[in-house]
Amino acid sequence: MQKLIIHGGKPLKGSINISGAKNAVLPIMAASILTDKLHITNVPKLTDVSTMKDLLRSHGADIKILEHPDEFELIINTGNINNFTANYEIVRKMRASIWVLGPLLTKYGKAKVSLPGGCAIGARQVDLHIAVLKAMGATIEIEDGYINASSKGRIKGTHFVFDKVSVGATINAILAAVLAEGETVLFNCGREPEIVDLCNCLIKMGADIAGVGTSEITIKGKDSLNKASYKVLSDRIEAGTYMFAAAITKGDVKICGIDYHIIENIALKLIETGLKVVQINNGVQVTYEGKLNSVDLETNPYPGFATDLQAQFMSLMTLSSGVSMITENIFENRFMHVPELCRMGADIVVRGNKAVVRGVEMLKGAEVMASDLRASVSLILAGLSTNSKTVLHRIYHLDRGFQDLEKKLSNCGADIKRV
């Protein structure tokens, strides 16, 4: 099994280009089921993208892949969908597989999707996905680990209030509603940039969607959608991760190819810690200026601080000048990186959904193991900060969400290699 060997202590200096957003491209790929042809650019080279390609092909899609140095270009033809079951063997690899449920149901009146897998960071139930589709008139049963959904004729528009903000359920509801009969109004929706990107793609395909980027989205169903071409937005989680990498290594890095407004909350949090963060053309520049203040953090739905960056921020706070409180409001079990950080000398105490982080002068290299995607990269950041050697095991998680991570870090002076 592959591992990463990191020799830390080298400030990162240079520039990093940000790849397409994983959490945007996956629902956009699922949206291809709603039309006959979708051309997608700025597609990141990730195993989760490969899994979604495998899933769409299992449904009968024909996918042409054009490979460029820093991205994929996908041409997805879905005019011959002939299988309406998303099998366990594919779905177990990635939770995003559930996003074929809405498109298959709304276009073909039936879908059978295995209950999903993915990172082991909490229950992340599918109750809200099922509830909103039932409100649209679907008949849904859970049998033998599968969601069986069907409808007599087209599903119907509805008014639905999510009892809590759910990015995944918001996406499935939108994907279903664009071909539903009548008007759907969704309340308490996720407002994440990736949801906005999906809506913009659907609008380009001919969907009628209002309220994009707000908590109330109105969708007037269409009889069909058009072919389209769409460029996926850049990955704010990747951008934030490299911003923290610059900070934890006391470096100076330009993060390029990202819209500032979707990473502004990250930039403001770093400024609180004492970092210099300057908006530049097509990105930001993060510079360490000799201090690292301890700052409290709470994760919340967008525009709050992303749960997908909590672990990385915690790594940074292990080296801060005081005590910080990190509160995880989105997922349970998302402190699984804490024992590994403590193996490296961090002083962290977890109490329920809160972690108290007392800054130490320096972390020490160690052999550590990744439990999930974001935890794995937090341990890399910790390793980069040390003056010794860190070995990270179970790095297959990384390839699900970070394209060319070692190359991007090495180009800025990091000593990191995969063996």
Curated annotation (Swiss-Prot):
InterPro entries: Enolpyruvate_Tfrase_dom, Enolpyruvate_Tfrase_sf, MurA_subfamily, RNA3'P_cycl/enolpyr_Trfase_a/b, UDP_GlcNAc_COvinyl_MurA. GO terms for cellular component: cytoplasm. UDP-N-acetyl-alpha-D-glucosamine binds at R95, K164, V165, S166, V167, D308, I330. One of its GO terms (molecular function) is UDP-N-acetylglucosamine 1-carboxyvinyltransferase activity. PANTHER family: UDP-N-ACETYLGLUCOSAMINE 1-CARBOXYVINYLTRANSFERASE (PTHR43783:SF1). This is UDP-N-acetylglucosamine 1-carboxyvinyltransferase. Belongs to the EPSP synthase family. MurA subfamily. It holds the Pfam family EPSP_synthase. It is found in: Cytoplasm. The active site is at C119 (proton donor). The modification 2-(S-cysteinyl)pyruvic acid O-phosphothioketal is found at C119. SUPFAM superfamilies: EPT/RTPC-like. It is an enzyme of class 2 (transferase). Cell wall formation. Adds enolpyruvyl to UDP-N-acetylglucosamine. The lineage of its organism: Bacteria, Pseudomonadati, Pseudomonadota, Alphaproteobacteria, Rickettsiales. The gene is murA. Phosphoenolpyruvate binds at K22, N23. Keywords: Cell cycle, Cell division, Cell shape, Cell wall biogenesis/degradation, Cytoplasm, Peptidoglycan synthesis, Pyruvate, Transferase.
